[in-house]
């Protein structure tokens, strides 16, 4: 366990840098110390950095300061008078419209993103968190480095929010979505919200906190996140979380939204990571699905009456924050809100980034177990892969914007 939150943040920032030179030069540039058996950089962002001077320039973008201008925030008047919360949010975003949340120039780094929005616009529009698509573009690129439904990006798949208490992603009651992944850019950044919901979004609140920099070191990598979904996985075929990545980088996290389509225990499948030319067999694998997400023995807990249940949890680097048999934003006077069992998990490789030099592929087996032993399963899986890499990156194979509403819709 890390001895302070600053050490956790320091480790997170270390994942942004790749190491391509000799050990001697690495020692000079990182000036690392050993803390609790882990290598930490002294000069990363954290509590220890607060005592040092810097040439970075603090900025933020939100509805009150859409350009992030110095001395240009909170200028709009309200019924209370000038500069009194005149533009707290974006209003009435039509279905099908794209909104540029941030269009930044020069070099810098996004340090924090906060967002909130309703999870349902009406009884006929319940899946807002799957139908708003968040995309990020770095350094003038034409294909996004981040393309993920809003809820899934913040570990809230199934179009329903849950409480998440981790280092890079935190979600607090009533859909307060927070992201602390460092997002550096060498020459500009553009963040776009795409409304593919079937109805207008009445109000969307957001803030993007960042710093302007004179320049960034050449070895700083950019942040990527990719969403995939199979409504029914193929029997005996591993589900692909990530592939088609070429270049040098670090794999830093997985989010999984799982809907069980069969009974019995679902979580015997192994996460497998193929690195740098691996073909038939991976270099890295887990011993089971719940093991990968930090649990064990089927997350088993007991109710007061002695019945088994799966115990949820949310920690700094791994969690099982969501488990439900009902989704409360889809009730109707004509049917109940019962669903197949839905679960959400995350695993952050921050103390232990999976480093690749040329390519990476990440997969998940769908294997269950019953009274007769292991068996191949078919379930509904959606996932987000998070990684840093050198640009340019390959276009994502499953484009979220090209999926239909049914392909995004939770069970």
Predicted regions and their residues:
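Beta-strand-centric surfaces of beta-sandwich/beta-rich domains
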Residues: 35-411
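Low-acidity, Ser/Thr- and Arg-rich intrinsically disordered low-complexity segments
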Residues: 3-6, 10-13, 17-21, 26-30
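Accessible peptide chain termini
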Residues: 1-3, 36
